[in-house]
Structure formats: C-alpha cells, structure tokens
C-alpha cells in the first residue's frame, strides 16, 4: 500500500488564505506589512526563490522590496544596506537570500539584521531564543515541516526522528523543534558512518542533503514518515528531491513530494513570519 502524500501545496494555500485576511485586518488598522529581500549575485536558483517570494507577497497584499546587488558587492556595502533597512520603520522584515557569494562572511552579514526584523530566524539572537524554547522567529522550513506534521496529526512524542543535514537553515533548528515535541533525535551528516543503519531505525526521517534521489526504500523501515527537504534539478531539467519518491512511497506511511511538499510550506511560513514582524513592531502583539 502506497504512502499517504503530505500535501504541502494544498496546506500552504489554506494558510495563505488565512494570512490574506490577517493582512487585510492590519491594513484596516493602518498597518502595511513590508518585506525587504536582498539578493546578491546571479545564482539562478536564488533568483527563482526570490521571484516566488515576490509573487506570494503580491498574492497576500504584502509590500515587497527587492534589492538585487552584483556578484562582486563588497561586504561593507551589503552591511550598509542592512543598516538602512534596520532603520527604515516602513520595513518590517529583512531577508538575505542564501547562499551568498563566497567572498562575503555569511555569519557577519546575518548578525547585522535587527532580530525583530529577522523573518528567516537565522540571527544568533533568534537561534538562541529557539534553543531555550522561547522562539521569536522560527526558521521557515523547519516551522513548515512541523506545521505539516501537526496538520496530518502525526504524533512525534517518543518517536525516533532522524535528521540528515546540519545547516542552520534546516537541520539544526528542525532538530530542536523535534526535541521540543519529545521525539528522540539523531542528527546525521556527510561524515556519518553506517548511515543506513541509522535511517532504518527512524520513525520520522527528514532529509536535507542536496543529493538527488539519495534515500531508497532499503534505507527506511516500513511505515516510516519521510520528509524530503531536498531540491535538485536533473540533467533533463526536472525538479526532484533527496528521496527516491516512487521507490520509497511503497514502504513509507507518509511522504512529502518534490515539488509540492516542503517548498510551498516554507514560503507560507515566511509570509506568516513577515506578518508577525509587522504586528510585533506596531505593538499589535507583544
């Protein structure tokens, strides 16, 4: 029997409809949410993600400001722009599209963002708040994954959760959120030995390694919940995940497709964070 599909696309549409009403309520109070997105360089994937974010802002009537900077932008220039956006009271959220060109210090750049405008949740302040179970902004992809698991009433308490990938974007914050739900979490990465022995014990397997169709059915146990966070483009131009979907779906109980799983939820959570930032700064919430 094939796995049930965790339909992130449909859930994201439902969430966006609710957010659209929230935006209208804020506008009725004279509050106009505004998200600033900074893109440095010519990375094609980054350009595509930024266009998705612009499009979704437009759908929800959130103002978006996109700053496209050349590949050779100096760090001082980027920091100066962030400082200006921090000071601009009309801008509620600031997002630096990652990855940055290699000559830029990602940590230094992210640290410069005002934590109360850090809608990606990547500043040391926001990550620290997440660590002590008092989050301000939760990184969008992990937040979307947990929301999806909740929607499908997938219980995490006492379950063995395996996360492959240790970035601050997905792996580390997702592990913290799973721990918060009382899962027993194992984090794996490129140096993990005997990976298959670990993945086969997972009740919940979350994969974010950037390797096309890497996870196969012989690497999971029957009935596992499989969350595919990978986005890879094949030689033919097809978008696929880190999981061999057609193979694994015959053994898993639930699985996310790529596209249409985690990706749409990430964008929806970004919009939710942007709206929350506007409320926070205008003191609609505390």
Curated annotation (Swiss-Prot):
NCBIfam families: PRK10792.1, PRK14186.1. SUPFAM superfamilies: Aminoacid dehydrogenase-like, N-terminal domain, NAD(P)-binding Rossmann-fold domains. NADP(+) binds at residues 165-167, 190, 231. This is Bifunctional protein FolD. The lineage of its organism: Bacteria, Pseudomonadati, Nitrospirota, Thermodesulfovibrionia, Thermodesulfovibrionales. The keyword Cell inner membrane does not apply. Pfam families: THF_DHG_CYH, THF_DHG_CYH_C. One of its GO terms (cellular component) is cytosol. Its EC number is 1.5.1.5, 3.5.4.9. Keywords: Amino-acid biosynthesis, Histidine biosynthesis, Hydrolase, Methionine biosynthesis, Multifunctional enzyme, NADP, One-carbon metabolism, Oxidoreductase, Purine biosynthesis. Coiled coil: none annotated. Pathway: One-carbon metabolism; tetrahydrofolate interconversion. Belongs to the tetrahydrofolate dehydrogenase/cyclohydrolase family. Homodimer. The keyword Flavoprotein does not apply. HAMAP family: THF_DHG_CYH. It comes from Thermodesulfovibrio yellowstonii (strain ATCC 51303 / DSM 11347 / YP87).
